[in-house]
């Protein structure tokens, strides 16, 4: 049978975040695979106790003997965040540029995994030979250091996987987009381009970090009191802008938040941020007058445990905020975070603190391509096939329309699990791989249907009842049950307790407890009775636990 070239997204197609993409080449049954990116997304309030969500890698785990490498485009969490959680199931080589390598080493260190013999550091614009794939890293621009597109060469043709990108003429830190090489790649012929869809609805160009710096300097020059800047820690160009503006306005700067320190250290380790003023410890910054300090902190999305939220609640041990200070949100609002972020901003304004954000000043540009950026990339690459990824369904469908406007002969719409045959023949979805999500519950990966998640949702919505019942040797109830309940809206506690005790006694009297099976039957009946009683009295059907104790 003839060799074939396949593409299969397991995450990031039909959603923003959690990127995981597979490429395969070879005869059916003899494919060799590479994985591009292995990211996470973050849970919302509908999943209490869950922090991270990542793609279910089961499809490729079953083929791990033929997985010859994980190739990482850049260091954002939605592209590398799952690597330390999922790699132990895959145990293959990893390829990344220096900055990304530093950050993933930290992730494995936290898991006590020695990745040294598997991690391959690729220099910027370097080449990786993973037969039958020859992968060339192409420097792009984005909202993080060292973003890369991948030119993936196979005997069947060339694929350009863009990763996350935009066209920034003045990125301030790191290299400019390698437009000359991209044009050469396009002129040599590209079978398919796998492309970022995030900002397909945004007109014009994405904008430059240099323009943000000019605006930030103008804003900060007019402020007289304490300044707190909240930004994504991973945006090192924005970090450098904060340092630059602090120095130009005669202020010192202090980093607040674990992620800020981690990214600053990694950037320094890779040779960046060498010419900025030295940050001072927040404990030292307390002794500096309000007019002479800038704090750069985490928490731009209103995260409950991040530095900015603690500062706003006056619970941070080192950073104090007061009336007439200013908080600058140099970031966009990630969809889903609006409520908690606006609550934070309202609290700040209520306390007499000025809030500056992209809603009222120019303090942020996106790291993803607007339509003019996309147009330019399509003109450079001229792909025969376009496959939109990194977007919700509405983004990807609009991107398909855009690709048609750019005269791409074969745009292909995909969702997670779709297997696209790029060669031979016209590119199209021809099969489906199993795909899904895994949830990090504590230190354990679970599926959404897991009992722990179901129980926690139930507890969160309906509360909890526990009844402990003493059973005599003759099988009857000894005294009244011991009751505990939480999260149930009870007006008259005494009335509720007495009523619940009566319901338990009524059920228990009807049972003879001579065997384990009879005990199990009683427990089931008591659970039903307790939930029914609570539903009638409070409208809640709580999670219920029954303990039978023989005396």
Region roles according to the model:
Residues 201-330, 334-359, 363-515, 523, ...:
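Hard-cation-handling environments
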Residues 15, 144, 289, 459-461, ...:
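Solvent-exposed loop and beta-edge segments used for protein-protein assembly and interaction
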Residues 108, 403, 534:
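Conserved hydrophobic residues forming the short capping helix/wall of the S-adenosyl-L-methionine
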